[in-house]
């Protein structure tokens, strides 16, 4: 079945199986790796993307259902090496560790902040209930969301990808943190069940 949609600002037209999930379309057809497959049962949120600006779990959406719509992945938030304010906040507040859940958390946060630009800590926790992280304990993730909201409220621009040594960490460590927020980390993790 032919499907036309916009992915990260680029118009696409592809032949797909009618039952192909959006997460698999993004990864296998588009080559975008940020949306991760963690459960395939809508439980973990690692596959979260924006569909017409609303965060959705892409393992629950058939690609044909997204026809004619706009899909944004974590890669689409960071054009030209600049981090989106949410991605920058996740890096700055250490709201990531292994990075598997991070792109989904980032996209859920972008969706949350578009609906509620000034959330309380309780509203952040409630808004991210559908996204699991096995590493961080959520404290730094919540701090990152609140920092992103404050940055957006102040009208601050996105930041460039990190330079080496500015905060005492190595350039490799800082770049890895930025890469995890954009879903482009070099050491891609294996998919659960793959």
What are the residue ranges of the model-derived segments?
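Signature of N-terminal electron-transfer/Fe-S-associated modules in redox systems
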Residues: 1-194
């Amino acid at each position: 079945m032919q499907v036309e949609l916009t992915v990260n600002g680029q118009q696409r037209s592809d032949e797909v199986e009618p039952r192909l999930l959006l997460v698999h379309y993004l990864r296998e057809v588009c080559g975008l790796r940020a949306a991760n497959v963690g459960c395939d049962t809508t439980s973990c949120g690692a596959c979260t993307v924006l569909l017409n600006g609303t965060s959705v779990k892409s393992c629950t959406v058939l690609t044909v259902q997204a026809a004619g719509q706009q899909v944004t992945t974590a890669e689409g938030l960071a054009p030209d090496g600049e981090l989106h304010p949410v991605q920058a906040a996740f890096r700055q507040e250490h709201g990531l560790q292994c990075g598997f859940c991070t792109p989904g958390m980032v996209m859920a946060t972008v969706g949350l902040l578009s609906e509620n630009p000034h959330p309380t800590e309780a509203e952040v926790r409630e808004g991210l209930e559908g996204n699991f992280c096995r590493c961080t304990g959520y404290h730094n993730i919540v701090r990152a969301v609140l920092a992103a909201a404050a940055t957006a409220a102040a009208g601050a621009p996105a930041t460039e990808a990190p330079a080496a040594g500015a905060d005492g960490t190595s350039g490799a460590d800082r770049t890895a943190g930025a890469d995890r927020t954009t879903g482009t980390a070099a050491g891609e993790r294996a998919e659960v069940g793959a």
